[in-house]
Amino acid sequence: MNPNQFTENTISAINLAVDISKGNMQQSIKPEALALGLLMQNNGLIPRVIEKMGLNLQYIISELEKEMNNYPKVEVKVSNENISLDQKTNSILNRAEKIMNEMEDSFLSVEHIFKAMIEEMPIFKRFGISLEKYMEVLMNIRGNRKVDNQNPEATYEVLEKYAKDLVELAREGKIDPIIGRDSEIRRAIQIISRRTKNDPILIGEPGVGKTAIVEGLAQRILNGDVPESLKNKKIFSLDMGALVAGAKYKGEFEERMKGVLKEVEESNGNIILFIDEIHTIVGAGKGEGSLDAGNMLKPMLARGELRVIGATTIDEYRKYIEKDPALERRFQTILVNEPNVDDTISILRGLKDKFETYHGVRITDTAIVEAATLSQRYISDRKLPDKAIDLIDEAAAMIRTEIDSMPEELDQLTRKALQLEIEIKALEKETDDASKERLKVIEKELAELNEEKKVLTSKWELEKEDISKIKNIKREIENVKLEMEKAEREYDLTKLSELKYGKLATLEKELQEQQNKVDKDGKENSLLKQEVTADEIADIVSRWTGIPVSKLTETKKEKMLHLEDHIKERVKGQDEAIKSVADTMLRSVAGLKDPNRPMGSFIFLGPTGVGKTYLAKTLAYNLFDSEDNVVRIDMSEYMDKFSVTRLIGAPPGYVGYEEGGQLTEAIRTKPYSVILFDEIEKAHPDVFNVLLQVLDDGRLTDGQGRIVDFKNTLIIMTSNIGSHFILEDPNLSEDTREKVADELKARFKPEFLNRIDEIITFKALDLPAIKEIVKLSLKDLENKLKPKHITLEFSDKMVDYLANNAYDPHYGARPLRRYIQREIETSLAKKILANEVHEKSNVLIDLDNNHIVFKEV
């Protein structure tokens, strides 16, 4: 008996037997300890054989442990030095060596030892383990392979370990129904039916349904809807991760891969191997001086001994497979295109039953149509049908979560009851009459509340129970349909008619009755919602993208109708500009904008300080209740020709390639924004070439080749071009407008200006507008003082004084802000610090002999 001839699992079993003996305080390794060592191996061969024989592994282990306890124990601690093999155990190992030679194996494996044990140990007959049955199961697992290395188990039933049988999964109903894709499946069948190079590879963008095509082929094989050459074939989906995982020693991965390929080869063409993400085979398992999986496949692929279906994305095909021409020419490509919206709707209708059964909710057809159309319109960085399926799944999960959670009304009652209970505990400690009276009132209120809570809880439980019944009936219907499919395949017409006209008809009637009951109860103030509608889909799209696609509420409609008035409250003296912008937003919100262009694009022209940038910020505030959704790009930073890369990201090979562009990254994260290009005349003219496709098609390709969607943005550009003409003519006559337009045309190319929706000229601010701005500025100052509870009042004289002194037509409203800071805010700050103006006081700001004075009133 040569220990060098032991396989890894044999050594592991003996070591386990040593530990069991030491734990049992026995100085010799009994045959039962060795048997336990074999049976307790994780993922070992012997536990697998026992399970395939239909025996209870845990029962055998417990019986052997009882036998172990019958042997004498020693009092001293047992160490590795003073432990030895029992005479009978030694005899079993010698017999195992003879069995190894009889089976023409090179190494002593666990199956040899277990066979020797069955022959030598009568206890196994008690468990119902016969030699004939053992050898039959062993040969089914082992086949005609010989033990010619120290890890032979790696080559036994490798497909069962490292792959899944898709045809079997389809038989069990674990694969979703595949709708459409007939031309791709037919082409795959044609390629597989070839004599040589019969290996199709499906290439397409992530999420277009490459894996689904192979699952569809598996379903067709199951239904017999394939040519004779493919009937009764099996498709095994190989798990490359499991194949590589745990391959510690050099050559172990190759051994597993060889086992897979040999098993496929020995099936005589009955097994088709499906490798999802096939680019992972290039370089998989490669180490110094060893082959990768791709090179191991090549010879068999070329000879047609191996039928492989691969699936990978276009980018990864180009990056990995095309770089290896010898591997590429062995595959025949099938391009899988993204389905259109109509095809996606058909796919979703086919999957509807599966999702309804899983989540226990009802999915309306409007939700399905909305999922396909909204995902196509708003989720641009993913592909159909995957993104639409995800929308339906998440919306159904949201409704299911709401069903399982406590309804809001009941939750409020529970919280209120808890609050009253706390109050009762506190009042019980009081002894005065008022507290006792209050205690009685609260106890009565709590009793009423608990009664109401009890009624609502009962109603909630009943509604949940009804919905749960529907879910269970749907699950039963699904199981009956699976049985019907099986009966149809086996041509068992008696069973098929029994199921179809008996069990299925009864269940469908039961489902209809239960559904009608839930619908009837639902009309009477139901606590739970059990339907996925278009509103839920719109809600999920809004959460994913930040774009408000849900139906407009009455308050939002009201807000949009009065958008012009709301903006005028903050922006003074530019009524024409405000009207143009507000009208554009109204058209967009009502759904009348061009769906392939931004919501609107404007150039604001005018002198400095007239409110061009402020209007953009105010618009964002009114649309989003925050100025954070303004993406501001200061064009003075783009004075060089090459600085355009900062907008869209550096090209490959340049520093900053991975970081993306300032504009594209901002819109990818916030696709619903106001984009403000400030001071556009300061930028290099070539920078605007990149904006042409944004203004025309509402899209821009960044430095990494990703398409960024600008269809939900409002683009505003500001400029001081022609401001000297505007200052000379405050009333903006037609002649002045033409002069400004001519100067603009001289600066920018016609193809750029032609794509702008509207060019708006801002007037220079007149004195009445400045007075309104003074009032707004003083109101802002009052808001700053709110934490100190100081209110401000100011006289009309004061407003006129500030307007006349701070106004400069060349500089607009900006000098006004500086003047208020200098003359009012500084003086007021000094008075607050000197305690001349106190908290919770009312301060009048007035004028006295052309001096600003502060009085507490």
From Swiss-Prot:
Residue ranges of coiled coil: 389-523
Chain residue ranges for the region called Repeat 1: 6-71
Renumbered residue ranges of the record's region C-terminal: 765-857
Keyword Ubl conjugation: no
ATP-binding recorded as keyword: yes
Pfam families: AAA, AAA_2, AAA_lid_9, Clp_N, ClpB_D2-small
GO cellular component, one term: cytoplasm
Region (NBD1) location: 157-338
Binding residue positions for ATP 2: 606-613
Region (Linker) location: 339-546
Region (Repeat 2): 85-144
Superkingdom of origin organism: Bacteria
GO terms of molecular function: ATP binding; ATP hydrolysis activity
Main location: cytoplasm
Location of this chain's protein in the cell: Cytoplasm
Start and end residues of each stretch annotated as NBD2: 556-764
Binding site for ATP 1: 204-211
Function of the protein: Part of a stress-induced multi-chaperone system, it is involved in the recovery of the cell from heat-induced damage, in cooperation with DnaK, DnaJ and GrpE. Acts before DnaK, in the processing of protein aggregates. Protein binding stimulates the ATPase activity; ATP hydrolysis unfolds the denatured protein aggregates, which probably helps expose new hydrophobic binding sites on the surface of ClpB-bound aggregates, contributing to the solubilization and refolding of denatured protein aggregates by DnaK.
Domain notes: The Clp repeat (R) domain probably functions as a substrate-discriminating domain, recruiting aggregated proteins to the ClpB hexamer and/or stabilizing bound proteins. The NBD2 domain is responsible for oligomerization, whereas the NBD1 domain stabilizes the hexamer probably in an ATP-dependent manner. The movement of the coiled-coil domain is essential for ClpB ability to rescue proteins from an aggregated state, probably by pulling apart large aggregated proteins, which are bound between the coiled-coils motifs of adjacent ClpB subunits in the functional hexamer.
Similarity comment: Belongs to the ClpA/ClpB family.
UniProt-recorded name of the protein: Chaperone protein ClpB
Organism in which the protein naturally occurs: Fusobacterium nucleatum subsp. nucleatum (strain ATCC 25586 / DSM 15643 / BCRC 10681 / CIP 101130 / JCM 8532 / KCTC 2640 / LMG 13131 / VPI 4355)
